[in-house]
């Protein structure tokens, strides 16, 4: 149970260390994370806070959501997410409170980043699963990109579940674990993590403290 933030992927750049080493980082904008609702054990059966992120006109959300934001006294957002917290931490928060980046995270901390991967549409097995293509010549006729056999004969007489075939590629939720925060820009509420994260620039991401930190090698 730890506090996370909703962010927007800005893009990638690089940072330089004092030794001159270039570090590729992804910039995440976590500004305007505001408390939209506080849930407690007494009223909801569990302890959590609901954060809103982004801005949206009240006329562009449903009446139910417009009332939900108005009750908390916050501007309508385009993203909502819950984070389970201890009752002691929730007691310190109030609806409408803005949570800055340095409150939730510190430089050098490991985090998990969840996002939706870039959709590639309907793709073949070569692009989707990195299958090898067929021969370009020497008797190969119109079978350059076919996947090959998809099963056996009359026994078992079916295609096994999970067989890798053509289909939709991308546009699924993925989480990258144990990314290190290289720097936090407190003035602009930006988090810079080492490496790449899922999604296209401008996409919604959720940043949470790492839950499965790897063991140190002896």
From Swiss-Prot:
GO molecular function, one term: rRNA binding
Residues where N5-methylglutamine is found: 154
One GO cellular component term noted in the UniProt record for this chain: cytosolic large ribosomal subunit
InterPro entries in alphabetical order: Ribosomal_uL3 (IPR000597), Ribosomal_uL3_bac/org-type (IPR019927), Ribosomal_uL3_CS (IPR019926), Transl_B-barrel_sf (IPR009000)
Post-translational modification: Methylated by PrmB.
GO process terms (BP): translation
UniProt keyword list: Methylation, Ribonucleoprotein, Ribosomal protein, RNA-binding, rRNA-binding
Assembly: Part of the 50S ribosomal subunit. Forms a cluster with proteins L14 and L19.
Family affiliation: Belongs to the universal ribosomal protein uL3 family.
HAMAP family: Ribosomal_uL3_B
Name used for this protein in its record: Large ribosomal subunit protein uL3
Organism from which the protein derives: Polynucleobacter necessarius subsp. necessarius (strain STIR1)
UniProt lineage: Bacteria, Pseudomonadati, Pseudomonadota, Betaproteobacteria, Burkholderiales
